[in-house]
Structure formats: structure tokens, C-alpha cells
């Protein structure tokens, strides 16, 4: 791939100034609060603080409990929380990246910390068909079913993407009051499809909208993703009233605030 080699050469300064530019773009296009899963301790939080924004920050947690740097990343997550504990605009989630980058033992350790210290969880979920097929092969369950089986949703959770969901997955998300962050432009750019928003709405799932990242979107202007959210489902369902402007406005405002509060 092309991304991993570039990520490996990224420095903390790169992360800070990239995040600061992102904050400037978000402010210019009307976003005042965001959540981000990052790689470098303190850099995104510092950029958000310097820009005067509100942010819910997550250190991306990848690996295993004692190996592959997993324990170190979890330690960094708590160090960062401590550094900003007195900052009223910066708060945190615990963020295992995905089920395919964290083993079961590591996920259970993160869940234990999240429940024990009342920290919300953030994870990429069912973004690709490959992720779902690998989960079925490895666990005999969809990613959503697997996370439910290990108690992940016992703590407040924000799940990004949620493109490839079964009806049972949607029932699980609704039952556990999981918030879903749809990222339509990113999902389309990467050829992954898009979240089944009308079905999620039918079951009362809290839906919000994200831009994912500049690398997979080319823009952090949330209004673009709001527009796509409304248009995609009208076209696919051949129904002009499907996913109305009023509903999309709520996704981008109140629902997003509920997911991060």
C-alpha cells in the first residue's frame, strides 16, 4: 500500500501542523467541534486547543495486549488524558482502531478500562466487505456481533462507517444505543459503498456525519458530506423524501453532539 510507508515517515510536527490546517479548514466551513483518532500523543489535542476548538480525541489503539506496541499505545492514551484533564474544551475516548487491528485480549483490556473509568469508546466498524468476511471466517460472527459478544457495547460507543450491516447488526446497534458516524464521501472515494441510513433511522439509531480524513475525502467541509448524505439515499431508494434536509441537519448537529457528550 501507499499509506503505511508515508505514515511511518510522519513526525509529531507533521501531525501538529496537519491538524492545525485541518482545524482552520473546519472553522472556515462552520465546524466548531470534532472527534479524531490519531497517531501522535498530544499533537491533535494541542492543535485543537490552539485553534480554540472543542475536540474529543482518541489515541488510535492497535496491536495486542503485551505485543505489537498495544500496551504502549494504551499508556500514551492515558498520559494524554492526564495532560488535558483541566482543559474544558478537550475530552477523550478510548479508540481501538478496528477488530482486524486488535486481538480479543487487547479489546477486552480496553473495554475494562472504558467501563471502569467511564470513558466512551470509538471504533471503525464494518467499513469494508473484506472486514466482514474475515470476521465471519475468524469468529463466525459479523464485526458487530463479535463486538457485542465480548461486551464492547456495554460502554457508550461511537462506531465509524457501519457500511456493511445485516439486519441483526442494526438491531444490536439500536439495542445498545450505539451512535453511528457515517462518512459518505470517504466511503464512496474508497469504493466501499455507504451506510444504510434509512434502515438505521427506522430502528432509532443515533446517526451523525463525519468527513473521515483529508486522505480519504479531500475536504473536511462537513456540508459536502451532508449534501451527499441526503442525495445518495434519495437516488438509491428512488424517493425524493428519503433522508430529508431536516434530518441531515439533525445528524450534523444535535445527533453529533449527543454522540460526543
Q: What are the language-model segments listed below?
A:
Residues 1-52, 74-86:
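Alpha-helical scaffold segments that flank or form the walls of functional sites
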Residues 29-31, 53, 118-120, 177-178:
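A structural motif
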Residues 30, 48, 94, 124, ...:
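Divalent metal-coordination and catalytic microenvironments
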Residues 34-35, 56, 122, 158-160, ...:
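Structural detector of well-ordered beta-strand residues that form the stable sheet scaffold
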Residues 43-163:
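Metal-coordinating catalytic core of metallo-dependent amide/deamination hydrolases
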Residues 129-141, 169-174, 191-200, 217-234:
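Histidine/acidic-residue-rich catalytic or RNA/ligand-binding cores of hydrolases
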Residues 149-156, 198-261:
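His/Asp/Glu-enriched, well-ordered alpha-helical/loop segment
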Residues 167-168, 174-205, 209-211:
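A conserved active-site cap/scaffold subdomain adjacent to cofactor or substrate pockets
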Amino acid at each position: 500500500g501507499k499509506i503505511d510507508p508515508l505514515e511511518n515517515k510522519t513526525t509529531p510536527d507533521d501531525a501538529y501542523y496537519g491538524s492545525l490546517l485541518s482545524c482552520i479548514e473546519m472553522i472556515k466551513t462552520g465546524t466548531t467541534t470534532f472527534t479524531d483518532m490519531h497517531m501522535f500523543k498530544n499533537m491533535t489535542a494541542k492543535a485543537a486547543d490552539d485553534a480554540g476548538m472543542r475536540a474529543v480525541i482518541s489515541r488510535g489503539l492497535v496491536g495486542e495486549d503485551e505485543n505489537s506496541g498495544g500496551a504502549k499505545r494504551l499508556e500514551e492514551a492515558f498520559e494524554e488524558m492526564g495532560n488535558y484533564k483541566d482543559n474544558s474544551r478537550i475530552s477523550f475516548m478510548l479508540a481501538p482502531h478496528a477488530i482486524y487491528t486488535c486481538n480479543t485480549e487487547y479489546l477486552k483490556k480496553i473495554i475494562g478500562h472504558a467501563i471502569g473509568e467511564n470513558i466512551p469508546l470509538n471504533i471503525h466498524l464494518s467499513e469494508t466487505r473484506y472486514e466482514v468476511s474475515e470476521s465471519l471466517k475468524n469468529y463466525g460472527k459479523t464485526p458487530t456481533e463479535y463486538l457485542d459478544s465480548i461486551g464492547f457495547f456495554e460502554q457508550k460507543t461511537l462506531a465509524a462507517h457501519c457500511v456493511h450491516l445485516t439486519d441483526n447488526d442494526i438491531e444490536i446497534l439500536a439495542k445498545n444505543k450505539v451512535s453511528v458516524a457515517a462518512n459518505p464521501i470517504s466511503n464512496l472515494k474508497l469504493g466501499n459503498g455507504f451506510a444504510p441510513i434509512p434502515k438505521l433511522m427506522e430502528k432509532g439509531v443515533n446517526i451523525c456525519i463525519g468527513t473521515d480524513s483529508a486522505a480519504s475525502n479531500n475536504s473536511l467541509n462537513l456540508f459536502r458530506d451532508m449534501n451527499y448524505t441526503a442525495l445518495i439515499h434519495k437516488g438509491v431508494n428512488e424517493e425524493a423524501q428519503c433522508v430529508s434536509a431536516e434530518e441531515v441537519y439533525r445528524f450534523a448537529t444535535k445527533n453529533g453532539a449527543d454522540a460526543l457528550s
